[in-house]
UniProtKB/Swiss-Prot annotation:
GO cellular component, one term: chloroplast
Enzyme Commission (EC) number: 4.1.1.39
Stored Pfam families: RuBisCO_large_N (PF02788)
Listed GO MF terms: monooxygenase activity; ribulose-bisphosphate carboxylase activity
Family in the record: Belongs to the RuBisCO large chain family. Type I subfamily.
More about this protein: The basic functional RuBisCO is composed of a large chain homodimer in a 'head-to-tail' conformation. In form I RuBisCO this homodimer is arranged in a barrel-like tetramer with the small subunits forming a tetrameric 'cap' on each end of the 'barrel'.
Gene name of the encoded protein: rbcL
Organism in which the protein naturally occurs: Malus domestica (Apple)
Subunit comment: Heterohexadecamer of 8 large chains and 8 small chains.
Described purpose of this protein according to its UniProt entry: RuBisCO catalyzes two reactions: the carboxylation of D-ribulose 1,5-bisphosphate, the primary event in carbon dioxide fixation, as well as the oxidative fragmentation of the pentose substrate in the photorespiration process. Both reactions occur simultaneously and in competition at the same active site.
Record-given protein name: Ribulose bisphosphate carboxylase large chain
Primary enzyme class: lyase
Length: 53
């Protein structure tokens, strides 16, 4: 029989929607030689701000 382990849901991340500007937007980010540029065209649904799409 394998040993039992305890899993805690709060370890690592919290579920839910976070404001984009608080979690991903870094205005003072400096690019590195290893960075890869990827571009996507996104059309927000009605009522969704463009920066949140």
């Amino acid at each position: 029989m394998s040993p039992q382990t305890e899993t805690k849901a709060s370890v690592g991340f919290k579920a839910g929607v976070k404001d984009y500007k608080l979690t991903y937007y870094t205005p003072d980010y400096e690019t590195k030689d290893t960075d890869i540029l990827a571009a996507f065209r996104v059309t927000p649904q009605p009522g969704v701000p463009p920066e949140e799409a």
